[in-house]
């Protein structure tokens, strides 16, 4: 799910522009199930999806496999370059934008996700999840690269495993849960270039390994139908080793240069939600985080929502939050390009919006929304290209990002088994 702006504070800190939450839930199937989907796209892009499920009163299992691949090679007119046309006296008489080919954008991604859930039938559910990723991607050169059209390889490979064990308990008026997990990531970045006669020389040979152990506990407690209180606490212990195996010493021999670092991260929050009527609600969140040995100031957030009209289900929402984001270990120590001198980001985010939904059952549904957001961020971290041929993160002193977003969805039933769906989005986001 996509958490816009302030709403990310409910889940985690650091989401100055929002956050993306990845989660799954039991399939709730009886017996065996099989699903297969194939997608075909431009530039010989293929997507394969296979899912096998089994479920009964107590057990739910799901096995999913996804494979995506594409050479992603296409021609385009490069408007970031201009080629000069000369006369016999080497005077510029014309200029044009060249037609170039994207030759380094292929990818092959494999995802395997295994889930097993057991429901005791007495309010407790236990889960075991494993997710494996194998990714092999080429990285295109910059569109402003004026180097000669020689052979090169600019490739990033990744293997990641995420394992989670979970417990959830649901009772009248309250619920709680706990999770524990382990994440392992191996990442390789190789940049080679033809130095002549077909000999490919390594310019960069980066290897990174990340091990993370984490735990999380959360709870919810209801008082009647008007009050909801929540609490959440999570801890992550990261261990990262990043090295470049292609550093040349002054004596001409290769050396391995890199970093080996560890960091603890804690995050805790409490919230209160009050709904005095079915047409109005307000909630407040307070979060605080520890990164290494540094605490953030208190991170507050306030949310308001109200039903303007039940006819058309017209709802207005508004929120405000303060937030902080520490540079990740990848920002600080990734080789090549990491910047150990980065400062943490901080900022305020405001947003407001209105939405509606109308329709007739079995005939059509129409919904839409309009949102405004305004964000002020200090020391924004952004990865930028360098003259050394790779990207590196740096702090931009002050950033003001604002804009509007419009969205509309229409679904029309053409027949009992057929429907036509249309959606549109518009955004205006200067900064």
Predicted regions mapped to residue ranges:
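N-terminal periplasmic accessory domains that precede
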Residues: 1-3, 10, 14-39, 48-50
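Extracellular loop and loop/strand-boundary signature of outer-membrane beta-barrel proteins
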Residues: 35-37, 47, 97-102, 145-155, ...
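Transmembrane beta-barrel wall of Gram-negative outer-membrane proteins
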Residues: 42-69, 81-136, 159-173, 221-229, ...
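Repeated loop/turn-to-beta-strand initiation elements of outer-membrane beta-barrel proteins
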Residues: 58-61, 123-126, 173-176, 226-229, ...
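Flexible loop and strand-edge segments within Gram-negative outer membrane beta-barrel domains
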Residues: 74, 103-109, 122-176, 184-211
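Surface-exposed extracellular loop regions of Gram-negative outer-membrane beta-barrel proteins
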Residues: 136, 186-188, 292-298, 306-351, ...
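Outer-membrane beta-barrel transmembrane domain signature of Gram-negative proteins
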Residues: 155-160, 182, 190, 194-283
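Gram-negative outer-membrane beta-barrel transporters
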Residues: 275-281, 367, 371-376, 395-431
